[in-house]
């Protein structure tokens, strides 16, 4: 009898010593049915957002007004020329709805603020996490319930990246190449693909950095300026180098909080002669080999368009 009791004790001790740790919550995504000891590793599905949504789209308009930094019509300076590129992709880092002309940057309704990093030293946009979309594509969807009920008159959008084709001339022959330009305040770039070629940097690049590719050859450079139209510069300025483009709704846009259907907000961006260069010989052809160089590659205006 003593031997039998001792056997039970030994079996009990073995049972206690063989506890299997894991997630014991059946509602978790990593529930372990074989676990008998919770190890605090449970993970749960992210809360699914529901509509209706504000659907933000991008549109590139080469026929829209060409504006300067103050939102006024802009002409091309003497000894310069410009062309309207064909856009293949663009990224924005920040979107904000502003109530009126006195609403300061950051004091409106911030709809989106992209990822940033200090991996390259100073704070910068994290290009590896950038959302890049083409013409008329959906940039993002925001549940309308997450937007504060109010009436908004202006949109502010910080652009960070552009990818487009350019016509140029070399040794008397016309070609078409691809340019990737980084127009954000500062961007940490691990690598990026221009057309067929990938450029590896693992470094920060300030506003105006660009890479150009054609026939398998990549050339890199830095533009001297980036136009950022802000019609509210007198009442609500933006920091230099921020690339925050400002545009107004044709009619005030009101969020009531009782919306039942999706609303589309198309960010129509002016690409009208947005790539400008110093034209050394005045032939209106972009000829890097003849002394031409980029002087401006900023967008030339923003018009937010609401479609119920």
Briefly describe each language-model feature range:
Residues 1-17:
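Sec-dependent bacterial lipoprotein signal peptides
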Residues 46-308:
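A short, solvent-exposed, low-complexity linear motif enriched for acidic/polar residues
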Residues 15-56:
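Bacterial Sec-dependent N-terminal signal peptides
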Residues 7-10, 29, 37, 98, ...:
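A generic structural micro-environment signature
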């Amino acid at each position: 009898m003593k031997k039998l009791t001792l056997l039970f004790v030994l079996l009990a001790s073995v049972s206690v010593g063989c506890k299997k740790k894991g997630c014991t919550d059946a509602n978790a995504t990593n529930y372990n049915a074989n676990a008998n000891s919770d190890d605090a590793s449970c993970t749960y599905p992210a809360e699914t957002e529901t509509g209706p949504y504000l659907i933000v789209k991008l549109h590139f308009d080469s026929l829209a007004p060409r504006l300067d930094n103050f939102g006024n019509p802009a002409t091309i300076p003497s000894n310069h020329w410009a062309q309207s590129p064909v856009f293949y992709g663009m990224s924005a880092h920040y979107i904000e709805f502003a109530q009126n002309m006195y609403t300061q940057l950051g004091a409106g309704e911030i709809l989106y603020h992209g990822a940033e990093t200090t991996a390259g030293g100073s704070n910068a946009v994290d290009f590896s996490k950038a959302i890049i979309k083409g013409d008329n594509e959906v940039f993002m969807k925001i549940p309308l319930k997450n937007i504060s009920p109010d009436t908004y008159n202006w949109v502010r959008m910080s652009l960070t990246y552009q990818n487009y084709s350019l016509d140029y001339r070399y040794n008397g022959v016309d070609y078409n190449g691809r340019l990737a330009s980084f127009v954000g305040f500062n961007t940490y770039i691990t690598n990026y693909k221009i057309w067929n070629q990938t450029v590896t940097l693992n470094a920060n690049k300030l506003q105006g950095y660009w890479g150009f590719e054609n026939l398998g050859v990549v050339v890199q450079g830095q533009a001297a300026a980036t136009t950022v139209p802000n019609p509210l510069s007198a009442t609500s300025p933006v920091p230099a180098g921020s690339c925050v483009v400002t545009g107004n709704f044709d009619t005030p846009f009101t969020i009531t909080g009782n919306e039942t259907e999706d609303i589309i907000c198309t960010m129509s961006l002016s690409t009208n002669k947005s790539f400008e260069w110093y034209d050394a010989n005045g032939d209106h052809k972009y000829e890097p080999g003849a002394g031409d160089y980029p002087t401006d590659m900023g967008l030339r205006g923003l018009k937010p368009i609401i479609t119920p």
